[in-house]
């Protein structure tokens, strides 16, 4: 695979193992060691795929833990076209099931034109392309031509070709459950309308898709009524009308992110409170128009909330904090980060300490969360009980 293999493998006995048992062995090996083992026996090489799941980043280093997988250098970031072509070739006969790539410059349209690519992609269920600069219109179009069983489609920080995106969504409309378009700033409203075909979609992220118009978002919402998670963070055109549409059509919603949707007001939050009492996670950070009235409404109606984020809601006062503590018994995380929160909302660190000490019983032992930024609070006793 375009790399000198320094190990010698005796394959005696491995060919007698069932595929499931052999896979347990292979999962302990690096991709090069797997290839060495399989290629030592022609029967094994023809029978077993080199890998059905390929992730280019390690998922363990500091870059991966910070969700900046494109900075990970521990696995396949700098591999050549020959490496990727060989990987596709030896992923057969079963082909790939999951492919997650972050900033892999060697993976391009030439690799996708290889004779092995079609069979490798035929059964693909999960596709993630994160900051892959080689994924131009041609490359994404080639992938779209080969995929028809996708359950998850994650295109992150890419200049996505609208024709290829349309084809990807249309060909996989019946199977898609997750669509994540985080940071795809070039996407416009007409580019996402095809999502209305995905009637079984459960998770949709348009985080940072600020060129998408409200009418297109509403169109998708009206046709994707099974959504359980919706992320509109930094989709700053979103207003109360869109939020009302969310409340009307998405009765299964459990997680809603409206961070920096600064046109949303108390009216929009009221519509959520009326129609989505079972919401579990709500992010209203930087929705600067919100007042105590909206948060008090949340506290009295959304009794199933476990996470509430209000960072940057500068009109709120300590009355909101008290109403949250008194009315949200399931809440385990409250995000009030930022100097603006301490100074404008709580009144500074001293006032916060006084508030917690004075209302200790009502605040149910709220404490600064370990490993979180200052201003993110958790209820330790409730977390321990839940565990």
Predicted regions and their residues:
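Amphipathic alpha-helical interface elements that mediate macromolecular binding in regulatory proteins
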Residues: 15, 19-23, 42, 141, ...
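N-terminal adaptor-interaction module of cullin-RING ubiquitin ligase components
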Residues: 1-144, 151-155, 162-169, 173, ...
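Short, solvent-exposed loop/turn at the beta-strand->alpha-helix junction
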Residues: 76-84, 105-113, 133-141, 158-166, ...
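CRL adaptor-proximal regions
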Residues: 1-16, 340, 370-387
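Leucine-rich repeat
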Residues: 49-52, 66-70, 90-98, 106, ...
């Amino acid at each position: 695979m375009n790399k000198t293999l320094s190990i010698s493998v005796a394959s005696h006995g491995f060919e007698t193992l069932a595929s499931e048992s052999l896979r347990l062995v292979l999962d302990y090996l690096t991709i090069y060691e797997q290839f060495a083992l399989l290629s030592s026996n022609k029967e094994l090489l023809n029978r077993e795929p080199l890998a059905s799941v390929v992730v280019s980043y390690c998922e363990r280093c500091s870059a991966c833990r910070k969700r900046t997988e494109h900075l990970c250098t521990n696995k396949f970031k700098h591999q050549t076209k020959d490496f990727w072509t060989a990987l596709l070739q030896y992923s057969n006969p079963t082909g790939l099931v999951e492919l997650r790539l972050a900033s892999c410059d060697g993976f391009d349209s030439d690799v996708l034109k290889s004779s092995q690519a079609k069979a490798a992609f035929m059964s693909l269920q999960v596709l993630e392309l994160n900051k892959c600069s080689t994924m131009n219109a041609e490359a994404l179009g080639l992938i779209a031509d080969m995929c028809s069983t996708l359950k998850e489609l994650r295109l992150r920080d890419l200049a996505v070709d609208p024709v290829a995106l349309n084809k990807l969504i249309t060909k996989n409309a019946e199977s898609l459950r997750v669509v994540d378009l985080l940071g795809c700033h070039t996407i416009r409203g007409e580019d996402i309308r095809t999502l209305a075909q995905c009637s079984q979609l459960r998770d949709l992220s348009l985080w940072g898709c600020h060129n998408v118009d409200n009418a297109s978002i509403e169109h998708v919402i009206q046709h994707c009524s099974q959504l359980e998670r919706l992320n509109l963070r930094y989709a700053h055109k979103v207003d109360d009308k869109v939020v009302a549409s969310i409340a009307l059509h998405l009765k299964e919603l459990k997680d809603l992110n409206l961070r920096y949707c600064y046109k949303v007001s108390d009216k929009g939050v009221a519509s959520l409170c009326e129609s989505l009492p079972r919401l579990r996670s709500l992010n209203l950070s930087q929705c600067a128009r919100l007042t105590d009235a909206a948060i008090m409404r949340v506290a009295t109606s959304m009794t199933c909330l476990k996470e509430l984020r209000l960072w940057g809601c500068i009109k709120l006062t300590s009355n909101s904090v008290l109403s949250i503590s008194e009315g949200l018994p399931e809440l385990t995380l409250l995000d009030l980060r930022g100097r603006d929160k301490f100074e404008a909302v709580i009144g500074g660190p001293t006032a916060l300490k006084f508030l917690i000490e004075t209302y200790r019983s009502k605040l149910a032992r709220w404490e600064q969360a370990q490993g979180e930024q200052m201003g993110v609070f958790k209820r330790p006793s409730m977390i321990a009980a839940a565990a």
